Amino acid sequence: MPEKSEIIKLSAYLVIISYVVCVICIGIAIAKSPWFSFPYNWLSELGNSNEGNTPVVDGILVCHVFNAGLMLGGLGGMAFSYGMYLSNIFKGKKGMLAIALFFLAMVFIFLTGFFSQDYGILHTISAFSFFFLVPLSLLAISLSTPGWTKLALRIVSVASLLAFVLLFVDRPWGSNSIVEFVPAIALGVGIILIVRMILSPNRVSATQPASQDRESN
């Protein structure tokens, strides 16, 4: 059975890879959708099979590329939440709350891709839940982190929360998808900070079983 530290490392690599893949899928969907406009379109429209006669890339509908990217990102994030649980950083009620909020955020980004915009209200609920949970989870995670990492997480969580509020405000200048990108970027920054923290040598060694320590002595 894999050691705890190895599972933590694997979950960290998975979340980074899945996040990058998700961003690439979104980028492909944008690049291959000439009708898409940052000021006026929502990102979710890229996942709508009826939007702008969705183009085909190598035999695959662009909407499926977009939705698959969201689902892969969510799966990687869910795996990472288990790695967070195994680490010795998030303890007590605050720590468990932080992990639970992060896990739920990842569940809802998965559901945002699973229930594409074609599904109407199911997609809307999933997407808005994700945008709401991202700042909450990052803020909760900051309560279990020290120093500048705490400050950085709080800054990106506040930025993400402001973006969430803007989703409900009439914006004559448009920028629909740009507002959506803020929590996505905040999540990416948060993931990097958390991965850096749980993969630090001291943290990883702290997760080694006590029996191994005794054997080494």
Predicted regions and their residues:
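Interfacial helix-start motif at the membrane-water boundary
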Residues: 48-75
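Cytoplasmic juxtamembrane regions at transmembrane-helix boundaries
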Residues: 79-105
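Membrane-proximal helix-loop-helix units in multi-pass membrane proteins
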Residues: 101-142
